[in-house]
UniProtKB/Swiss-Prot annotation:
GO terms for molecular function: glycine binding; glycine dehydrogenase (decarboxylating) activity; pyridoxal phosphate binding. This is Probable glycine dehydrogenase (decarboxylating) subunit 2. It comes from Bacillus licheniformis (strain ATCC 14580 / DSM 13 / JCM 2505 / CCUG 7422 / NBRC 12200 / NCIMB 9375 / NCTC 10341 / NRRL NRS-1264 / Gibson 46). The modification N6-(pyridoxal phosphate)lysine is found at K273. It holds the Pfam family GDC-P.
Length: 485
């Protein structure tokens, strides 16, 4: 095995090798069957790797060097808001009063933690223009489902059982139609117009007495602000439907505009994105949901309330959709988000949006001469390019993404949204310096020139990574998901 190989930890195993040696037993030996029912005892030993501590350290350290995160490099993944997560968040989250408590403790012993949750809810209400917020949902899609279930409960409580359809734009996140389906709705697609915005005439066509809600991201997934949002709200509300805000792109409007003022009835947020809870690797996340007054009765229970200066959970909510998560949400991520909001303040959050939008537009204008710009207008926090020009030269958007790896950059989101051919979606966030943006811009320009002059360099990329291109078809059809001898 050379130093560039990366064996599985099972393949490093040597029979009889141990990581730790225990002292000689100095207490009476106990038969495991005396303390554990035989039904729960394995018939044979688990096939675990036998390795030393040094083997473990080198194995996982080597793997970590191959990983890419916000702390190691630029991560312009569109619609993901991969901003830097301030380390003060981690320090606060590790305070014993936050990290060493248990959700089953008596409320009287965790008043400080409950106060934080209550204050966080109030801050999020102010930021979004909602009347009340629940912190239970564990992530964005979970928040979507929670919000839709409240909308469903509202319609059913009003005897409006025919509202079975949720409208989503053709540029929507894939989680929107998925969440609607899981919540028991049928999805209806509304088209975008030539400007990349929701087509109002098509919206009027699809809205009817069966419409439960319209789900929107604003700005949308193309990075464009839905400038007709007030008219859209009127169209949906006049038909008896509700307007749902997907908070994936809230980073573009912090302290500048509020979903509640745009006419939205329900909002979900991604604290692990906009409010710097670390994300990636599957979690944990936090997807709070805010609602307007008439939907408050349907919030998940229990609801945190303040009575006589004390914080307590109110379980007496007869119209609630019930719990959506055990206990009270992902507390550690909520602590980090609260720390971020209090650290930044209203003016700081406004500056976040201003810099995020400035960075995106700066990059867009610098790259427009080299890549197709489907929507040549002011963008918000992210923007979309198209690799159509390069595709004519035999270089696909996938090739461009692979080539970026050679320069130490994580690729942007590609081939999404689906309504843009050879889509390249870039979100720089506010935390990146001009020097970093310029380095990425220069690299993208170099790749565009390579596509014209030496396309094979891009087509065969990456060249410097340990793992080159995988057989993606084989990986999809014959995945190897577990180790076998």
């Amino acid at each position: 095995m050379n130093n560039q190989d990366q064996s599985l930890i099972f393949e490093v195993s040597k029979e009889g090798r141990v990581g730790y040696s225990l002292p000689e037993l100095d207490v009476p030996e106990t038969d495991v069957t005396d303390v554990i029912d035989e039904a729960y005892i394995r018939d044979e030993p688990a096939d675990l790797p036998e390795v030393s501590e040094l083997d473990i350290m080198r194995h996982y350290t080597a793997l970590s060097r191959r990983n890419h995160g916000v702390d190691s490099g630029f991560y312009p993944l569109g619609s993901c808001t991969m901003k830097y997560n301030p380390k003060i968040n981690e320090k606060i989250a590790r305070i014993p009063g936050f990290s060493a408590i248990h959700p089953l403790q008596d409320e009287a012993t965790v008043q400080g933690a409950l106060e934080l949750l209550y204050d966080l809810s109030e801050h999020l209400e102010e930021i979004t223009g909602m009347d009340e917020v629940t912190l239970q949902p564990a992530a964005g899609a979970h928040g979507e489902w929670t919000g839709l279930m409240m909308i469903r409960a509202f319609h059913e409580a009003n005897g409006d059982h025919k509202r079975t359809k949720v409208i989503v734009p053709d540029s929507a996140h894939g989680t929107n139609p998925a969440s609607a389906t899981v919540a028991g709705f049928e999805t209806v697609t509304v088209k975008s117009n030539d400007d990349g915005l929701v087509d109002l005439e098509d919206l009027k066509r699809v809205v009817d007495e069966e419409t439960a809600a319209l789900m929107l991201t604003n700005p949308n997934t193309l990075g464009l602000f839905e400038e007709n949002i007030l008219e859209m709200a009127e169209i949906v509300h006049s038909a008896g439907g509700k307007l749902y805000y997907d908070g994936a792109n809230l980073n573009a409007v912090l302290s500048k505009a509020r979903p509640g003022d745009m006419g939205f009835d329900v909002v979900h947020l991604n604290l692990h994105k906009t409010f710097t809870g670390p994300h990636g690797g599957g979690g944990p996340g936090s997807g709070p949901v805010g609602v307007k007054k008439e939907l408050i009765p349907y919030l998940p229970k229990p609801v945190l309330v303040k009575k006589d200066g004390r914080y307590t959970f109110d379980h007496d909510r007869p119209h609630s959709i019930g719990r959506v998560k055990p206990y009270y949400g992902n507390f550690g991520i909520n602590v980090r988000a609260y720390t971020y909001i209090r650290s930044m303040g209203p003016d700081g959050l406004k500056e976040v949006t201003e810099n995020a939008v400035l960075n995106a537009n700066y990059m867009m204008r610098k790259l427009a001469p080299y890549y197709d710009l489907p929507f040549d207008r002011h963008s918000k926090h992210e923007f979309v390019l198209s690799g159509r020009r390069q595709k004519k030269l035999g270089v696909r958007t996938l090739d461009i993404a692979k080539r970026l790896l050679d320069f130490g950059f994580h690729p942007p989101t590609i081939y999404f949204p689906l309504n843009v051919e050879e889509c390249i979606m870039i979100e720089p966030t506010e935390t990146e310096s001009k020097e970093t943006l310029d380095a990425f811009i220069d690299t993208m320009i170099q790749i565009a020139k390579e596509a014209e002059e030496t396309p094979e360099v891009v087509q065969e990329a990456p060249h410097t990574t340990v793992v080159k291109r995988m057989d993606e078809t084989k990986a999809a059809r014959k995945p190897v998901l577990r180790y076998e001898k």
